[in-house]
Amino acid sequence: MPNPLARAKHNASINPQLNPSINPKVNAAINPNFNPWINPTRNSRIDPKFNRSLNPLLTASLNPVRNCLLDPKQTRKFSGLCRLTPESELLGYVVRTRQKAVLLFFDKDLNWTAHAVDNSREGYNVFDREGDWKGYVLKNQAGGWNEFNLEGDWTGFIV
């Protein structure tokens, strides 16, 4: 039987281009450009530049450089979530922190590349290592998340 992830691009539960309810270009309620509650530039509670407790650059317990339990190079106890392209190619991995509001993103070589902060509306905002907002992650209907850039383009999914 073929790998179901290989068919993600053709699966309306995952692909937002096939499902308007999970497509931020069609559904303004899930698009941070139109919904100020999930936009970190308009809601400082979900902006790690203002809410230091959500910032792994400033909070040692969330920083994989300072907390080896969060670094997949140093521990085997990580969540095991994978970041994939829309074509189901491996982009990297996701580590859940003890603080459920923060996820850490790593590339295929297990280098820390970004972090994501819970937007309190079943999604996360993605920030690069410098703390700049680069995109967002929204729940899909297959039990995972879809990743988008700031323009709302689908860049991948997490399972």
Model-derived features: where do they sit?
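Repetitive, compositionally biased segments used for assembly/scaffolding
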Residues: 2-159
